[in-house]
Amino acid sequence: MAIHLYKTSTPSTRNGAVDNQVKSNPRNNLIYGQRRCGKGRNARGIITARHRGGGHKRLYRKIDFRRNEKDIYGRIVTIEYDPNRNAYICLIHYGDGEKRYILHPRGAIIGDTIVSGTEVPIKMGNALPLTDMPLGTAIHNIEITLGKGGQLARAAGAVAKLIAKEGKSATLKLPSGEVRLISKNCSATVGQVGNVGVNQKSLGRAGSKRWLGKRPVVRGVVMNPVDHPHGGGEGRAPIGRKNPTTPWGYPALGKRSRKRNKYSDNFIIRRRSK
């Protein structure tokens, strides 16, 4: 979708740049309410995830990541805004009467038809196993475990590339730059996730950020020593340490935090680029 620039009529719209949001009238049988998760607190009320709280109430949309309506053609009826993700979603009416939401593929318009199965055309929005796709195909919503549903490349603008097939595995280049192996029997959707201009958005004011449930972030260097290892000192003092740390004293900014000898290390050919 296109990015809309506001006229500078007020200070809050001076730097605002938002996408042209499509209206959302979700179907009642495809939504359900969510219980608020304590605004970043645990069961004792202690903050465990900082900078969270507030925000507008949301209804969760049930998204079909499995695409298990095999060999049944569906038509895109609406393209809707989803408050739970950056990508848009589209409502599909299948030939057997089933109605489901899927992630909106880039370039798909109302009236287009999609289908999932083993021998379906390599067309944007169609879902099929990796073994039936030619090399170089751009894909998204990729399964890691067969039948579990898509888990990779689901964010707005995300796209992966099928670069090799050998034996029982397919080699994919993911949006992060990581190259890894996945079973050829796993399914994926052809094309790129829509709303590629989401990274060009500028909320323009603090209130828009609060609507998203995100609270202000304060630098540790301006805190007191009791609140952060970087705090204290006279005037604009440096952090007083060799390397920056988290509020709890652990290394920050570059320290690798992935668990060693993780089972999935055997499937990763090249680590993601920093």
UniProtKB/Swiss-Prot annotation:
<dbReference type="InterPro" id="IPR005880">
    <property type="entry name" value="Ribosomal_uL2_bac/org-type"/>
</dbReference>
<dbReference type="InterPro" id="IPR014726">
    <property type="entry name" value="Ribosomal_uL2_dom3"/>
</dbReference>
<dbReference type="GO" id="GO:0019843">
    <property type="term" value="F:rRNA binding"/>
</dbReference>
<dbReference type="GO" id="GO:0032543">
    <property type="term" value="P:mitochondrial translation"/>
</dbReference>
<dbReference type="InterPro" id="IPR022671">
    <property type="entry name" value="Ribosomal_uL2_CS"/>
</dbReference>
<dbReference type="GO" id="GO:0009507">
    <property type="term" value="C:chloroplast"/>
</dbReference>
<keyword id="KW-0150">Chloroplast</keyword>
<keyword id="KW-0687">Ribonucleoprotein</keyword>
<dbReference type="GO" id="GO:0005762">
    <property type="term" value="C:mitochondrial large ribosomal subunit"/>
</dbReference>
<comment type="similarity">
    <text>Belongs to the universal ribosomal protein uL2 family.</text>
</comment>
<dbReference type="InterPro" id="IPR012340">
    <property type="entry name" value="NA-bd_OB-fold"/>
</dbReference>
<dbReference type="Pfam" id="PF03947">
    <property type="entry name" value="Ribosomal_L2_C"/>
</dbReference>
<comment type="subunit">
    <text>Part of the 50S ribosomal subunit.</text>
</comment>
<dbReference type="Pfam" id="PF00181">
    <property type="entry name" value="Ribosomal_L2"/>
</dbReference>
<dbReference type="GO" id="GO:0003735">
    <property type="term" value="F:structural constituent of ribosome"/>
</dbReference>
<dbReference type="InterPro" id="IPR002171">
    <property type="entry name" value="Ribosomal_uL2"/>
</dbReference>
<dbReference type="InterPro" id="IPR014722">
    <property type="entry name" value="Rib_uL2_dom2"/>
</dbReference>
<dbReference type="InterPro" id="IPR022666">
    <property type="entry name" value="Ribosomal_uL2_RNA-bd_dom"/>
</dbReference>
<dbReference type="GO" id="GO:0016740">
    <property type="term" value="F:transferase activity"/>
</dbReference>
<dbReference type="InterPro" id="IPR008991">
    <property type="entry name" value="Translation_prot_SH3-like_sf"/>
</dbReference>
<keyword id="KW-0934">Plastid</keyword>
<feature type="region of interest" description="Disordered">
    <location>
        <begin position="225"/>
        <end position="274"/>
    </location>
</feature>
<protein>
    <recommendedName>
        <fullName>Large ribosomal subunit protein uL2c</fullName>
    </recommendedName>
</protein>
<feature type="region of interest" description="Disordered">
    <location>
        <begin position="1"/>
        <end position="22"/>
    </location>
</feature>
<keyword id="KW-0689">Ribosomal protein</keyword>
<dbReference type="InterPro" id="IPR022669">
    <property type="entry name" value="Ribosomal_uL2_C"/>
</dbReference>
